Amino acid sequence: MNRRRRYTGSNPSLRRVLYRAHLGVALVAVFTAGLAVTLVGLLTLRAYADPNQQLIARSISYTVEAAVVFGDAQAAEESLALIASSEEVSSAIVYDRQGQPLASWHRESTGPLHLLEQQLAHWLLSAPTEQPILHDGQKIGSVEVKGSGGSLLRFLLTGFAGMVLCLLLTALGAFYLSRRLVRGIVGPLDQLAKVAHTVRRERDFEKRVPEAGIAELSQLGEDFNALLDELESWQARLQDENASLAHQAHHDSLTSLPNRAFFEGRLSRALRDASEHREQLAVLFIDSDRFKEINDRLGHAAGDTVLVNIAMRIRGQLRESDLVARLGGDEFAVLLAPLASGADALRIADNIIASMQAPIRLSDGSTVSTSLTIGIALYPEHADTPAALLHDADMAMYIAKRQARGSRRLAELNDPRILQEEKEIDSATPEAPPK
């Protein structure tokens, strides 16, 4: 059997996936753009560094020309330092006519970035620039200028700081925009998931998904709501059918009274309650007199009308807490619970018998009369089980029917108190006419 795979919580949520995707795309885009701008800037700086270095060398050659002519090393060094110190130069050397160094200048190593500047100059700048020193058109010496990587390092550090700042700003912007986008996408999906979870767990088919701001998600919500409409309708029909089947299984189709199975179950629960609370209850077994004669002489339709009227008249003499059921044929049973005394059961039985004095009107306009014979069994005096109570009430009904139809009789019990109550009620009740 295929088992449905359940979500374990180890997979990332859609919200997190979208956040990661948006942030990753933004960071990659900014990093790529920053790297491209940095490379272009470095190439541009290098393109301008070589001509600038040549201009510096030419300017130095003009400045130290007189000092080289007169061989004044001190003047050459002063002129050299004056120009080189203010330019992007790491070192400058003036050579005389014989190629011997006449004056030199080297930028002092200051700060921990000096080595990095030298390395950048070695990687990115061209070889030292050499410029001849001319006097009256004759070469009297030369100047060698070596560029510095300070500008390159400052550019790289500034570019790196700018890139980091852009990355931070981009991350914040991407997070803000992603939240808005995710709210529009994940929000409706979360609502749909919550509704689906509620429907699955609580069977609440009245839940609906609210409208989303995105067309596709809105269409999905409408389709899901339409599915819920169908499920709600199907669930309602199923509940109605189940209720109807349950009613049919426990009720008589003709009189709509509970059947024997329902009565016995209710009687069992009533006995447990009576035992726990030390209360009394009574079971009345009722049989219709002359019903077979009416059914054979007037037909089944007349017999059905008689049964329906009997059920209505019995129900009319009972309390809301009492129960009347049709056991089958023309036999009925009544459960009286709770019961103050056995005398109350006898009085209710007399009321039921008296309710049958009025004739029953049939569908053709004619009338027919019938009577009821009732047997009564009490708990706990006569029996303490459903079967025993029904049996005792049934036996009492048959004895009463043999003695006089349209009467009632209490089950046999050698209890003087119960017998005395029955005698007192019998003496106060007019004798029923023979049937």
From Swiss-Prot:
Enzyme active site: D330
Pathway recorded for this protein: Purine metabolism; 3',5'-cyclic di-GMP biosynthesis
Compartmental location: Cell inner membrane
Name of the protein this chain belongs to: Diguanylate cyclase TpbB
InterPro entries in the record: CHASE8, DGC-Regulatory_Protein, GGDEF_dom, HAMP_dom, Nucleotide_cyclase, Rev_trsase/Diguanyl_cyclase
Cofactor: Mg(2+)
Keyword rRNA-binding attributed: no
Keyword Ribosomal protein listed: no
EC number(s) recorded for this UniProt protein: 2.7.7.65
Binding site for Mg(2+): S288, D330
Entry's cofactor comment: Binds 1 Mg(2+) ion per monomer.
Phenotype on disruption: Static biofilms of the disruption mutant exhibit a maintenance defect, which can be further exacerbated by exposure to peroxide. The mutant biofilms produce less c-di-GMP than wild-type strain and exposure to peroxide enhances motility of surface-associated bacteria and increases cell death of the mutant. Inactivation of the gene suppresses the phenotypes observed in the tpbA mutant.
BP GO annotations: signal transduction
Region of interest called Disordered, as start-end residue ranges on this chain: 414-435
Entry keywords, A to Z: Cell inner membrane, Cell membrane, GTP-binding, Magnesium, Membrane, Metal-binding, Nucleotide-binding, Phosphoprotein, Transferase, Transmembrane, Transmembrane helix
Pfam families named among the record's database cross-references: CHASE8 (PF17152), GGDEF (PF00990), HAMP (PF00672)
Ranges where the HAMP domain occurs: 183-236
Membrane topology label: Multi-pass membrane protein
Cytoplasmic topology ranges: 1-22, 176-435
Catalytic activity: 2 GTP = 3',3'-c-di-GMP + 2 diphosphate
